[in-house]
Amino acid sequence: MEATPSLACANKCVFCWRHHKNPVGREWRWKTDDPTFIVDEGVKTHIQMIKETKGIPGVRMDRWEEAHTVKHCALSLVGEPIMYPRINEFLDELHKRHISTFLVTNGQHPDAIATLRPITQLYVSVDAPTPESLEAIDRPLFRDAWDRLRRSLRSLKDKGQRTVARLTVVKGWNSDEVEGYANLIALGHCSLVEMKGVTFCGKSDASNLNMSNTPWHHEVIDLA
């Protein structure tokens, strides 16, 4: 299941496939739904989506039935999940149902990362190797965005759990400065580094990216 407890984010990344339809903010200022309600509705909606695939040619019924039981939850659908004020209760609710948790954060809320309870896998997005490129790519609302990212990465080494530095490669924007990436990743002693090429999702008034910014697979491998 892919879900999020927060639609809001403190960045306006040039590669955001949501085309910036979600709200932005540096702190939470919206209605706070109950964690159990969010999980209940998320699971219910997930099951409804699975049911709608029953008549598709090639669907195996054993796999279809298995998919009704949520075993894993990726908190990366939209927005910044760690902004949700009751994030730890939300994660506890998933764990009580024996659902593993994979949370992706943009690294702009280091204090929330420090107080986050153990989860299955914690990702921090490392979108740029320098302060200047971070400002250009993430277009953060926080003026101290670079410092926040570095603090977030430093806190990973104290988490005592599996952690990941996630890089989204945008050709011509952040596809060089390998040493800068290496220095950032080293701050967190990350268990893993996940690297992916940006996917061009069509023209948007909020960004001037085009297909030329999508790297070839071999270019991503070379950077890795």
Predicted regions located by residue number:
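Short Fe-S-cluster ligation motifs
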Residues: F37-E65
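C-terminal accessory regions of radical SAM enzymes
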Residues: H218-A224
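Hydrophobic, Leu/Ile/Phe/Ala-enriched alpha-helical segments that form helix-helix packing faces
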Residues: G42, H46, I50, L153-L156, ...
